[in-house]
Amino acid sequence: MAKQVEKLVKLQIPAGKATPAPPVGPALGQAGVNIMGFTKEFNARTADQAGMIIPVVISVYDDKSFTFITKTPPAAVLLKKAAGVQKGSGEPNKTKVASVTKAQIKEIAELKMPDLNASSVETAMSMIEGTAKSMGFTVTD
């Protein structure tokens, strides 16, 4: 008999820095997962992406075992890194805080392709451009 998924837990954790402290510990503790087992495995799997925020979807089964899938970093995090800023604009329509090039947007779109609901790189680029504009970034050629 196949294991039944009892709960899905979605978290965003810095790569290689998962600890049993909040928010990881309480979220997994409620689901009955071995927290240390998860943190060790997550840190080992994401050690090469240090400095990035990694979204993770943890499937908890009825016997309290788990599997997890790591996703690509959020577009906003990648855009901030490309533009070299700490945060986006509080008023994106009025105040522009940084600019990104089409080449940087294409690079981010290609990296995010597996997680985006887009059929082509051009469609993915327009999605990333929309995120950039909503953060107060200007897009230059």
UniProtKB/Swiss-Prot annotation:
Processing and modification events after translation: One or more lysine residues are methylated.
Kindly give the SMART domains that the UniProt entry links to this protein. Answer: RL11
**Biological function:** Forms part of the ribosomal stalk which helps the ribosome interact with GTP-bound translation factors.
What is the name of this protein? Answer: Large ribosomal subunit protein uL11
Keywords, alphabetical: Methylation, Ribonucleoprotein, Ribosomal protein, RNA-binding, rRNA-binding
User: Alphabetically, which GO biological process terms does the record hold?
Assistant: translation
Intrachain S-S bonds = none
Homology family: Belongs to the universal ribosomal protein uL11 family.
The record's listing under PANTHER family reads: 60S RIBOSOMAL PROTEIN L12 (PTHR11661), LARGE RIBOSOMAL SUBUNIT PROTEIN UL11M (PTHR11661:SF1)
- Which species does the entry assign this protein to? Lactococcus lactis subsp. lactis (strain IL1403)
Record's GO cellular component, any one? cytosolic large ribosomal subunit
